[in-house]
Design a protein with these regions (language model features):
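C-terminal catalytic lobe of FAD-dependent flavoproteins
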Residues: 2-57, 63-180
Length: 180
């Protein structure tokens, strides 16, 4: 929603390149891996089979998605891609779509570079920027790095509001590399 909110200020150049990621869920008995398995797909991407309790999760896809939807669809092509990629590496699993217990998908708000490169080629690093009116925004990043992203936003807010006081924010690990 970063581009939508920033667009409320008027002239705003989109910074995001949206990517849809899909996961499939199987009963662990259908894909009884003991540890996370990294698989290379036919198009040189990487997907994972992750065991957790009675389930094994397979994912994720990484495809351009033109708009930000709260519940992005899981397409038949997504399912076929993940199933065929997994069967290529683990043919003994014999996974089929009728064995899927659940699916989910989400949107990655990657920071685009204007080059038109595929989403799989874009950096997952977050960026923090400030609009002319002072709106602080963050885009990109990974869910697993949410604490580091939050720290950058808090530090940027803190330093911007206390220009004269250069004390570090309590608990902060960094003093440099801030968004100003």
């Amino acid at each position: 929603w970063v581009d939508e909110v920033c667009g409320l200020e008027g002239d705003h150049q989109s910074r995001l390149a949206l990517s849809r990621g899909v996961h499939l869920v199987f009963d662990h008995a259908d894909l009884p891996v003991r540890n996370t398995v990294v698989m290379r797909t036919h198009d040189s991407r990487r997907i994972f089979a992750v065991p957790l309790g009675q389930y094994t999760y397979i994912g994720t896809t990484d495809d351009y998605h033109p708009e930000c939807e709260y519940w992005p669809p899981v397409t038949e092509q997504d399912v076929d891609y993940l199933l065929s990629s997994t069967r290529r590496v683990m043919p003994e699993a014999n996974l089929t779509a009728d064995r899927i217990v659940s699916v989910w998908s989400g949107i990655r708000p990657l920071v685009g570079d204007g080059s038109g490169r595929a989403s799989k080629e874009l950096s997952r690093k977050e960026e923090v920027w400030t609009s002319p009116s002072g709106l602080l925004s963050v885009g990109g990043g990974k869910l697993s790095a949410y604490r580091a992203m939050a720290e950058r936003v808090v530090e940027a807010t803190y330093y911007r509001s206390l220009v004269a006081d250069r004390n570090r924010l309590a608990g902060s690990r960094r003093a440099s590399g801030l968004c100003r």
